């Protein structure tokens, strides 16, 4: 989901 950005 939009939480994919947390992978940074």
From Swiss-Prot:
Protein's UniProt keywords contain Transferase: no
Family from the record: Belongs to the FARP (FMRFamide related peptide) family.
Keywords per UniProt: Amidation, Neuropeptide, Secreted
Species of provenance: Penaeus monodon (Giant tiger prawn)
Subcellular location: Secreted
GO process annotations (BP): neuropeptide signaling pathway
Gene Ontology CC terms: extracellular region
Residue positions where Phenylalanine amide is found in the record: 8
Name assigned to this protein: FMRFamide-like neuropeptide FLP1
Domain of life: Eukaryota
């Amino acid at each position: 989901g939009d939480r994919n950005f947390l992978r940074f």
